[in-house]
Regions:
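Short helix/loop capping segments that flank catalytic or ligand/cofactor-binding pockets
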Residues: 43, 50-52, 92-94, 118-121
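Helix-rich catalytic cores of soluble enzyme domains
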Residues: 40, 46-49, 60-64, 114-115, ...
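DPxDG-like acidic metal-binding loop motif
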Residues: 45-89
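Glycine-rich flavin
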Residues: 1-55, 70
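Glycine-rich beta->alpha junctions and the first turn(s) of the following alpha-helix
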Residues: 99-197
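C-terminal helix-coil-helix/basic helical segment that borders enzyme active sites and/or dimer interfaces
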Residues: 199-206
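A generic structural signal for well-ordered coil/turn residues at beta-strand boundaries
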Residues: 29, 54, 79, 86, ...
């Protein structure tokens, strides 16, 4: 829904306002778009679109092409536009055959020369593209991914470290005379792990 702030108001309303269950999902892969009258011709082959089975719209991060070459913006960087496509118009490629994380339903889809109206595209993370301004939408989407993923990783690391410290109170390795917590090597490694975890947390928050 962060993309709602860069979409045209009527498009944002169509996706997230008119439908209480409206949602947008996307994933990585190869995607290109060529400007045509009133919009873009999109060709893509995308995968790992987590949440796509629950979404009502899908996104495709397309490299913009001009004469077959990537377009460059004023900053010299390749122009990438996110195309917003109704899920009802695509066929899901079932590729998410996994043991873990099955519920994410991270399947994919492909399109060839598919027309997307100009209004159904956005450029993410550019202040000048915002159609709705609020402090929340100045936070970059890449930072949302980073904070979300790293927060989970640090939570797992913290739980594992606490579990190990609890284990070390009574655990005595075979042939050892003392429990783990009395071992100076273990003490040093736990201290290093604590320091690294705290440093990562400080880096993320600060």
């Amino acid at each position: 829904s962060m993309s709602a702030a860069t979409a045209q108001p009527d498009v944002a309303r169509l996706i997230w306002g008119d439908d209480p269950a409206g949602g947008l999902a996307w994933g990585p892969g190869k995607a290109t778009a060529v400007p045509v009258d009133d919009g873009y011709s999109v060709t893509c082959d995308l995968a790992f679109c987590s949440g796509m089975h629950n979404a009502t719209w899908l996104g495709a991060h397309c490299i913009m092409l001009e004469d077959g070459e990537p377009m460059k913006g004023a900053d010299g960087k390749t122009v990438v536009r996110t195309m917003l496509i109704p899920k009802s118009e695509i066929k899901i490629n079932v590729i998410w055959d996994v043991v873990g994380l099955r519920a994410t339903g991270s399947d994919g889809y492909a399109l060839e020369d598919y027309f997307v109206p100009a209004a159904h595209s956005v450029i993410r993370d550019k202040d000048e593209e915002l159609t709705y301004r609020a402090p929340l939408y100045l936070f970059r989407q890449t930072n949302l991914f980073a904070s979300g993923f790293s927060g989970v990783a640090m939570g797992i690391a913290h739980s594992m470290l606490q579990a190990f410290k609890k284990l070390s109170i009574d655990k005595r390795p075979r042939l050892a005379k003392t429990v783990l917590k009395e071992n100076t090597v273990v003490q040093a490694d736990v201290a290093l792990a604590e320091a690294r975890l705290n440093a990562a947390r400080t880096f993320l928050i600060s």
